[in-house]
């Protein structure tokens, strides 16, 4: 059996009178790819931001690797990739994007190049991130999460606006990261996206979990 890396217990959140997460309970295992699915406005992104420590829950508990974890402690361990990637990508080129924020040692440069190779982005290494396609930007954002060694990665609507080819490429990379032991949560309203890359789905409606089911066995 795979290790439980993330557990959510009785999580509640609201904005004013509007309840966006009500008594949310679920577990995620190492190497699992889970879809948080449901229509827009059902609290999916809010839950994602809470798990990543970007938003403090009103009540409830988030447990990482068996230990209760406050929002600050979740930063960096749970990596949130938003839908609007242009607000996240700042580097001069792809290598700079992956190595920014630290002095670039030869080892760090090699690690970044290996990640770009794995994500099939090496041909674009000298390009500015803004010149990439939507699918390539998603893969680059995954690369940034890998450079930070985040064990849990949350992608918010990763296939939004992508054509079939780019969607398949992003799905392939998500499954590849899961095989490397990363736990991936995919926030989506798109059943096709969930079917393409996830093994399990948690359905949300009006801030509540209405279903939690296997899509397929672990690969």
Q: Residue spans of the language-model regions?
A:
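Helix-to-loop junction immediately C-terminal to a conserved catalytic motif
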Residues: 52
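Catalytic Walker B motif of ABC-type/P-loop ATPase nucleotide-binding domains
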Residues: 153-156
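Conserved ABC ATPase "signature" region
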Residues: 107-124
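H-loop/switch region of ABC-family ATPase nucleotide-binding domains
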Residues: 188-189
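The feature captures the beta-strand-to-loop junction immediately N-terminal to the Walker
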Residues: 37-39
């Amino acid at each position: 059996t795979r290790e439980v890396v993330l557990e959510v217990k009785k999580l509640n959140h609201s904005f004013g009178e509007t309840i966006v997460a009500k008594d949310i309970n679920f577990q995620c295992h190492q190497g699992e790819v889970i879809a948080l699915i449901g229509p827009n406005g059902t609290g999916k992104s809010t839950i994602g931001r809470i798990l990543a420590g970007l938003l403090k829950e009103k009540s409830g508990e988030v447990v990482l690797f068996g230990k209760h974890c406050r929002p600050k402690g979740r930063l960096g361990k749970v990596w949130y990739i938003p839908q609007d990637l242009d607000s996240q990508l700042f580097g001069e080129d792809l290598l700079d994007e992956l190595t920014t924020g630290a002095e670039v040692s030869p080892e760090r440069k090699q690690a970044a190049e290996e990640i770009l190779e794995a994500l099939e982005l090496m041909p674009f290494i000298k390009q500015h991130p803004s010149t990439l396609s939507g699918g390539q930007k998603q893969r680059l954002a995954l690369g940034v999460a890998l450079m930070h060694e985040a064990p849990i990665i949350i992608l918010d609507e990763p296939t939004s606006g992508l054509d079939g080819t780019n969607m398949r490429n992003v799905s392939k990379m998500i499954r590849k990261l899961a095989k490397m032991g990363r736990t991936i949560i995919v926030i989506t309203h798109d059943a096709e996206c969930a079917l393409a890359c996830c093994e399990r789905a948690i359905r949300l409606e009006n801030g509540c979990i209405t279903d939690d089911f296997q899509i397929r066995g672990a690969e």
